[in-house]
């Protein structure tokens, strides 16, 4: 599957691969938080301080990795900011695997809400 096809499947997330074909290749999955994508899930814990920013997405992704893809915990790293969720690695296939699984989670709002109920505020 091409990067273009994969990105269509991952919308509104975007997978970016840098320096492809070199030993310095790396990839990152990004979600710019300029829309209300899944904000209702984060609103379920608003009273606890969750607002749906990049750090809150990190908290959700951490629970997802711990419970669904623990083998990727050591190879992925977060680089989020308040207005952006980002996770990446030099292991492009690991980022793709995470991206597909995490997007599937987001498409299942009840499972997403369940996992988010175990997230810890950073």
Where are these regions (language model features)?
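Structured alpha/beta or helical-core interaction and ligand-binding surfaces enriched in interleaved
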Residues: 1-84, 89-97, 104-122
């Amino acid at each position: 599957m091409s990067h273009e096809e994969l990105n269509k499947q991952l919308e509104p997330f975007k997978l970016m691969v840098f320096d492809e074909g070199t030993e310095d290749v790396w990839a990152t999955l990004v979600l710019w938080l300029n829309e209300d994508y899944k904000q209702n899930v984060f609103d379920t814990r608003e009273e606890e301080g969750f607002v749906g920013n990049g750090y809150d997405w990190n908290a959700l992704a951490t629970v997802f990795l711990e419970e669904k893809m623990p083998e990727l915990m050591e190879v992925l790293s977060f680089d989020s900011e308040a207005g952006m969720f980002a996770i990446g690695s030099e292991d492009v296939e690991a980022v793709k695997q995470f991206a597909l699984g995490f997007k599937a989670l987001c498409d299942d709002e009840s499972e997403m809400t369940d996992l988010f109920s175990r997230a810890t505020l950073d």
